[in-house]
Amino acid sequence: MKTPTDLTSYIRVLKLASTPTWDEFSKVATIAGLGILLVGFIGFVIFSIMTFVPGGP
């Protein structure tokens, strides 16, 4: 591992990075929230099906 080379590449990435605008942030947050809700809904559906199947928990 070449520490000086790694540090310079990290610094280069940090200089190129910028703070997202409010519009970008809200879009990403909305998509992430919808993804979390979708995964939770799929889990609930699987749990509901397994509850009614004989031999389920």
Curated annotation (Swiss-Prot):
Q: How does it sit in the membrane?
A: Single-pass membrane protein
For this protein, the record's InterPro entries field holds: Prot_translocase_SecE_dom_sf, Translocase_Sec61-g, Translocase_SecE/Sec61-g
Membrane-spanning ranges: 33-53
Write down the Gene3D superfamilies for this protein, in alphabetical order: Preprotein translocase SecE subunit
Q: Where in the cell is it found?
A: Cell membrane
Q: Which domain of life is it from?
A: Archaea
Q: Does the keyword Transmembrane apply?
A: yes
Q: Name one GO molecular function term.
A: protein transmembrane transporter activity
Name a biological process GO annotation: protein secretion
Q: Which UniProt keywords apply?
A: Cell membrane, Membrane, Protein transport, Translocation, Transmembrane, Transmembrane helix, Transport
Q: What's a single GO CC term here?
A: plasma membrane
Q: Assembly and partners?
A: Component of the Sec protein translocase complex. Heterotrimer consisting of SecY (alpha), SecG (beta) and SecE (gamma) subunits. The heterotrimers can form oligomers, although 1 heterotrimer is thought to be able to translocate proteins. Interacts with the ribosome. May interact with SecDF, and other proteins may be involved.
Q: What does this protein do?
A: Essential subunit of the Sec protein translocation channel SecYEG. Clamps together the 2 halves of SecY. May contact the channel plug during translocation.
Protein family per UniProt: Belongs to the SecE/SEC61-gamma family.
Q: Which NCBIfam families match?
A: PRK09400.1-6, secE_euk_arch
Q: Per its record, how is this protein called by name? A: Protein translocase subunit SecE
- Gene name, per UniProt, is secE
